[in-house]
């Protein structure tokens, strides 16, 4: 997920 650092 682009808005999460692990996404």
Curated annotation (Swiss-Prot):
Q: Which residues carry this modification: Pyrrolidone carboxylic acid?
A: 1
Q: Which UniProt keywords apply?
A: Amidation, Amphibian defense peptide, Pyrrolidone carboxylic acid, Secreted
What are the boundaries of the signal sequence? none
Q: Where in the cell is it found?
A: Secreted
The Gene Ontology biological process terms listed for this entry are:
defense response; positive regulation of smooth muscle contraction
Q: Where mainly located? A: secreted
State which tissues express it.
Expressed by the skin dorsal glands.
Tell me which family the UniProt entry assigns to this protein. Answer: Belongs to the frog skin active peptide (FSAP) family. Peroniin subfamily.
- What's the protein here called? Peroniin-1.1
Q: Which organism is it from?
A: Litoria peronii (Emerald spotted tree frog)
Please spell out the taxonomic lineage of the organism that makes this protein: Eukaryota, Metazoa, Chordata, Craniata, Vertebrata
């Amino acid at each position: 997920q682009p808005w999460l650092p692990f996404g």
